[in-house]
Amino acid sequence: MMKKRLLCIAAAVLMVLAAVFAFGCEKQFPSEQEVLKSHLDKYCRENGEKIIEKYKNYFSGAQCSACYVDNSALVIEFRFDEKISDPEFQQRFAPDMENIIAEFRPIAQEIADASEITYTGVVLMFLDSEGQQVQSIPIGANNSNMIVDFSD
């Protein structure tokens, strides 16, 4: 009778320990999305001002105005000093799109390498003078799973 009681107590203690361990493990390992956001936040804090300064006048008529994290990408925002439509944007920048992507791909690659998550990248966000979105261009790393879709 005493052995059964000790076995029951031991089993109960083990179940409690297992539950505590399982709960503790759940809290110790952040999700892939949390890891990515942490890497992106850190990258933005350390490099945001440099990116804004470097690309301040990269696009004719648009200033690099912000660098921030949104979803699973680093957003580099450009604001035009005029009202511009999507067709006007396409006419001005579509012929140079390969060079634009090549210019920003190293940033996407650096982020993907640091976080070891391939579906991340950079999104170039273009706003007109009134703050309305004109175009967004997602750029993934070289081996990225990030979907690049220029149709909007």
Which residues are covered by each model-predicted region?
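Bacterial N-terminal signal peptides that target proteins for export
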Residues: M2-A11
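Hydrophobic core
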Residues: M15-A19
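Bacterial signal peptide processing site
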Residues: E26-Q28
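Alpha-helix boundary/N-cap detector
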Residues: S31-E46, E88-N99
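Polar/charged, Gly/Pro-rich intrinsically disordered segments
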Residues: K37, D41, R45, E49, ...
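Short, non-transmembrane amphipathic alpha-helical segments
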Residues: I52, D86-S115
